[in-house]
């Protein structure tokens, strides 16, 4: 016989994954202040394999408006600089031979709106994933009824699943509101 608790836990795991995905996606959307996580998505070629910049250099934020990158291998300066220029972050690195400095310019009103829109799109993707997890859970419960699960147990489990769903949707809304506030703050 199918365990209702397992079905709910599996759905909850899928919902957790959607929230973790959103956290990661929102971390890469710049909000006007310097953050080392801004560069996490940029990969560079290091001895034949693509690795994050943080694997080949020390990445720090000396102040709220700049990021410094100090490559451990001098040959990586050009590679890192090119990768940053080629990224869609809209930032220009300055290479002085010792460190690469990235000035984070203040965001324009238009760019802030674009970023807020991008956040909403990422949030919508996460919400769809959560709804799909709920749907999969409900489908598994309906199948369990055919395998001998009592209908009132199914209804109770669906109600629990809906509560879990609502909790995750609220968490996503909260994350989006926080990021939107961060982006729109001048």
UniProtKB/Swiss-Prot annotation:
GO molecular function: ribosomal large subunit binding
CDD domains named in the record: RRF
Family annotation (InterPro entries): Ribosome_recyc_fac (IPR002661), Ribosome_recyc_fac_dom (IPR023584), RRF_sf (IPR036191)
Subcellular location, principal: cytoplasm
Superkingdom: Bacteria
Keywords: Cytoplasm, Protein biosynthesis
BP terms from Gene Ontology: translational termination
One GO cellular component term noted in the UniProt record for this chain: cytoplasm
Cited SUPFAM superfamilies: Ribosome recycling factor, RRF (SSF55194)
UniProt subcellular location: Cytoplasm
Transmembrane segments: none
Similarity section: Belongs to the RRF family.
Function as written in the Swiss-Prot or TrEMBL entry: Responsible for the release of ribosomes from messenger RNA at the termination of protein biosynthesis. May increase the efficiency of translation by recycling ribosomes from one round of translation to another.
HAMAP family, alphabetized: RRF
Name of the protein in question: Ribosome-recycling factor
Lineage: Bacteria, Pseudomonadati, Bacteroidota, Bacteroidia, Bacteroidales
């Amino acid at each position: 016989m199918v365990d209702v608790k397992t079905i709910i836990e599996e759905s909850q795991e899928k919902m957790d994954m959607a929230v973790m995905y959103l956290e990661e996606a929102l971390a890469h959307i710049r909000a006007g202040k310097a953050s080392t996580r801004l560069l996490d998505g940029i990969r560079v070629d290091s001895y034949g394999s693509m690795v994050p910049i943080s694997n080949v250099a020390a990445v720090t934020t000396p102040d709220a408006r700049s990021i410094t990158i100090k490559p451990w291998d001098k040959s990586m300066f050009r590679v890192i600089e090119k990768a940053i220029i080629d990224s869609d972050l809209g930032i220009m690195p300055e290479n002085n031979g010792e460190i690469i400095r990235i000035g984070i310019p203040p965001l324009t009103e238009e760019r802030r709106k674009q970023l807020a829109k991008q956040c909403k799109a990422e949030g919508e993707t996460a919400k769809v994933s959560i709804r799909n997890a709920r749907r999969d859970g409900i489908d598994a419960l309906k199948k369990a009824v055919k395998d001998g699960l009592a209908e009132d147990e199914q209804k109770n489990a669906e109600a629990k699943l809906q509560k879990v769903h609502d909790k995750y949707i609220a968490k996503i809304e909260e994350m989006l509101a926080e990021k939107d506030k961060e982006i729109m703050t001048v």
